[in-house]
Protein backbone atom coordinates (compact mmCIF):
# COMPACT_ATOMS: atom_id res chain seq x y z
CA UNK A 1 0.00 0.00 0.00
CA UNK A 2 1.30 3.52 -0.72
CA UNK A 3 2.77 5.58 2.09
CA UNK A 4 0.46 8.36 3.31
CA UNK A 5 2.86 11.18 4.20
CA UNK A 6 0.06 13.46 5.35
CA UNK A 7 -1.14 10.89 7.86
CA UNK A 8 2.36 10.36 9.22
CA UNK A 9 2.16 12.88 12.05
CA UNK A 10 4.85 11.37 14.21
CA UNK A 11 8.28 12.10 15.59
CA UNK A 12 11.49 10.20 14.84
CA UNK A 13 11.45 8.53 18.23
CA UNK A 14 7.75 7.67 17.98
CA UNK A 15 8.50 6.01 14.63
CA UNK A 16 11.25 3.99 16.32
CA UNK A 17 8.79 2.89 19.02
CA UNK A 18 6.30 1.87 16.32
CA UNK A 19 9.05 -0.23 14.70
CA UNK A 20 9.74 -1.89 18.07
CA UNK A 21 6.03 -2.73 18.40
CA UNK A 22 5.93 -4.11 14.90
CA UNK A 23 9.18 -6.12 14.90
CA UNK A 24 9.87 -6.83 18.59
CA UNK A 25 12.66 -5.78 20.93
CA UNK A 26 14.91 -8.71 20.03
CA UNK A 27 14.96 -8.05 16.28
CA UNK A 28 18.14 -6.49 14.90
CA UNK A 29 17.51 -2.81 14.16
CA UNK A 30 20.84 -2.07 12.50
CA UNK A 31 24.34 -3.35 11.97
CA UNK A 32 27.26 -0.99 11.51
CA UNK A 33 30.37 -1.39 9.32
CA UNK A 34 32.21 -2.99 12.26
CA UNK A 35 29.57 -5.76 12.15
CA UNK A 36 28.13 -4.73 15.49
CA UNK A 37 24.39 -5.49 15.43
CA UNK A 38 22.04 -3.74 17.82
CA UNK A 39 18.49 -4.87 18.58
CA UNK A 40 15.52 -2.53 18.68
CA UNK A 41 15.32 -3.03 22.45
CA UNK A 42 18.96 -2.11 23.02
CA UNK A 43 18.64 0.87 20.67
CA UNK A 44 15.70 2.22 22.70
CA UNK A 45 17.47 1.50 26.00
CA UNK A 46 20.69 3.17 24.82
CA UNK A 47 18.74 6.14 23.48
CA UNK A 48 17.07 6.69 26.86
CA UNK A 49 20.30 6.32 28.85
CA UNK A 50 22.40 8.56 26.57
CA UNK A 51 19.56 10.94 25.73
CA UNK A 52 18.87 11.68 29.39
CA UNK A 53 22.55 12.56 29.97
CA UNK A 54 22.67 14.78 26.87
CA UNK A 55 19.34 16.40 27.79
CA UNK A 56 20.88 17.51 31.09
CA UNK A 57 23.48 19.50 29.12
CA UNK A 58 21.17 20.97 26.45
CA UNK A 59 17.84 22.76 26.14
CA UNK A 60 14.55 21.36 24.83
CA UNK A 61 14.28 22.24 21.14
CA UNK A 62 18.02 22.96 20.89
CA UNK A 63 19.76 21.98 17.67
CA UNK A 64 22.71 19.75 18.63
CA UNK A 65 25.48 19.06 16.12
CA UNK A 66 26.49 15.42 15.61
CA UNK A 67 30.00 14.89 14.26
CA UNK A 68 30.06 11.11 14.31
CA UNK A 69 30.67 8.25 11.89
CA UNK A 70 27.77 6.17 10.57
CA UNK A 71 27.98 3.62 13.36
CA UNK A 72 25.79 2.41 16.23
CA UNK A 73 26.79 5.40 18.34
CA UNK A 74 25.37 7.81 15.76
CA UNK A 75 21.98 6.06 15.77
CA UNK A 76 21.82 5.83 19.57
CA UNK A 77 22.79 9.52 19.89
CA UNK A 78 20.33 10.67 17.23
CA UNK A 79 17.42 8.78 18.79
CA UNK A 80 18.53 9.78 22.30
CA UNK A 81 18.40 13.46 21.41
CA UNK A 82 15.06 12.96 19.65
CA UNK A 83 13.59 11.12 22.65
CA UNK A 84 14.20 14.18 24.81
CA UNK A 85 13.02 16.85 22.36
CA UNK A 86 16.41 17.92 21.01
CA UNK A 87 17.06 18.38 17.28
CA UNK A 88 20.06 16.44 15.93
CA UNK A 89 21.99 18.34 13.24
CA UNK A 90 24.07 15.91 11.18
CA UNK A 91 27.49 17.35 10.37
CA UNK A 92 29.32 15.82 7.41
CA UNK A 93 32.97 15.52 8.44
CA UNK A 94 34.03 15.30 4.77
CA UNK A 95 32.63 18.79 4.07
CA UNK A 96 35.80 20.53 5.27
CA UNK A 97 36.39 23.04 8.05
CA UNK A 98 35.01 26.06 6.19
CA UNK A 99 31.69 24.36 5.35
CA UNK A 100 31.38 22.82 8.81
CA UNK A 101 31.88 26.24 10.42
CA UNK A 102 29.24 27.68 8.09
CA UNK A 103 26.85 24.83 8.96
CA UNK A 104 27.34 25.50 12.68
CA UNK A 105 26.45 29.17 12.09
CA UNK A 106 23.45 28.45 9.85
CA UNK A 107 21.79 25.96 12.23
CA UNK A 108 22.81 27.66 14.69
CA UNK A 109 24.61 25.19 16.95
CA UNK A 110 25.91 25.86 20.46
CA UNK A 111 26.66 22.19 21.24
CA UNK A 112 28.46 19.50 19.23
CA UNK A 113 28.51 15.82 20.19
CA UNK A 114 31.42 13.77 18.88
CA UNK A 115 33.83 11.00 19.82
CA UNK A 116 37.53 11.26 20.66
CA UNK A 117 38.17 7.96 18.91
CA UNK A 118 36.48 9.24 15.74
CA UNK A 119 38.29 12.60 15.86
CA UNK A 120 41.61 10.76 16.28
CA UNK A 121 41.02 8.10 13.60
CA UNK A 122 39.65 10.56 11.03
CA UNK A 123 42.38 13.09 11.88
CA UNK A 124 39.84 15.82 12.63
CA UNK A 125 41.71 17.53 15.50
CA UNK A 126 41.99 20.84 13.63
CA UNK A 127 38.38 20.62 12.45
CA UNK A 128 36.92 20.09 15.93
CA UNK A 129 39.16 22.83 17.31
CA UNK A 130 37.89 25.25 14.65
CA UNK A 131 34.18 24.42 14.86
CA UNK A 132 34.30 23.99 18.64
CA UNK A 133 35.31 27.62 19.24
CA UNK A 134 32.50 29.28 21.17
CA UNK A 135 30.59 25.99 21.38
CA UNK A 136 30.38 23.22 23.94
CA UNK A 137 31.91 20.00 22.63
CA UNK A 138 30.62 16.83 24.31
CA UNK A 139 32.63 13.64 23.81
CA UNK A 140 30.67 10.39 24.02
CA UNK A 141 33.57 8.73 25.85
CA UNK A 142 33.23 11.31 28.65
CA UNK A 143 29.47 10.76 28.86
CA UNK A 144 30.02 6.98 29.05
CA UNK A 145 32.51 7.42 31.92
CA UNK A 146 29.95 9.50 33.83
CA UNK A 147 27.19 6.89 33.56
CA UNK A 148 26.16 5.53 36.93
CA UNK A 149 24.11 2.51 37.93
CA UNK A 150 21.27 4.97 38.61
CA UNK A 151 21.46 6.29 35.03
CA UNK A 152 21.28 2.75 33.67
CA UNK A 153 18.37 1.89 35.98
CA UNK A 154 16.43 5.01 34.95
CA UNK A 155 17.10 4.15 31.30
CA UNK A 156 15.84 0.60 31.83
CA UNK A 157 12.69 1.90 33.55
CA UNK A 158 12.11 4.38 30.72
CA UNK A 159 12.51 1.55 28.20
CA UNK A 160 9.69 -0.32 30.00
CA UNK A 161 7.26 2.55 29.31
CA UNK A 162 8.92 4.30 26.35
CA UNK A 163 5.82 6.01 25.00
CA UNK A 164 5.00 7.60 28.35
CA UNK A 165 8.55 8.88 28.89
CA UNK A 166 8.86 10.13 25.32
CA UNK A 167 5.54 12.02 25.47
CA UNK A 168 6.78 13.90 28.56
CA UNK A 169 9.87 15.20 26.75
CA UNK A 170 9.19 15.04 23.03
CA UNK A 171 8.80 17.80 20.52
CA UNK A 172 5.61 17.69 18.48
CA UNK A 173 5.33 16.24 14.99
CA UNK A 174 5.28 19.77 13.53
CA UNK A 175 8.57 20.72 15.20
CA UNK A 176 11.91 20.20 13.44
CA UNK A 177 13.03 16.56 13.74
CA UNK A 178 16.55 16.73 12.36
CA UNK A 179 18.74 19.22 10.50
CA UNK A 180 20.47 18.03 7.34
CA UNK A 181 22.89 20.23 5.44
CA UNK A 182 23.07 20.58 1.70
CA UNK A 183 25.42 22.76 -0.30
CA UNK A 184 23.73 25.95 -1.35
CA UNK A 185 23.91 27.64 -4.73
CA UNK A 186 26.80 29.82 -3.54
CA UNK A 187 28.54 26.77 -2.09
CA UNK A 188 27.63 27.58 1.54
CA UNK A 189 25.74 24.86 3.40
CA UNK A 190 22.02 25.31 3.90
CA UNK A 191 20.14 23.60 6.70
CA UNK A 192 16.99 21.74 5.68
Feature annotation, model-predicted:
Residues 68-70, 115-117, 175:
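Helix N-cap/beta->alpha junction signal
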Residues 137-181, 188:
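Conserved pre-ATP/AMP-binding loop-to-beta segment of ANL
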Residues 28-79, 96-101, 152-161:
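Conserved AMP-binding/adenylate-forming core of the ANL superfamily
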Residues 1-16, 27:
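Flexible, non-catalytic linker and terminal segments flanking ANL/adenylate-forming cores
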Residues 19-20, 43, 47, 64, ...:
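Adenylate-forming
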Residues 56, 83-155:
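Structural core segment of the AMP-binding/adenylate-forming
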Residues 15-39, 177-179:
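AMP-dependent adenylate-forming
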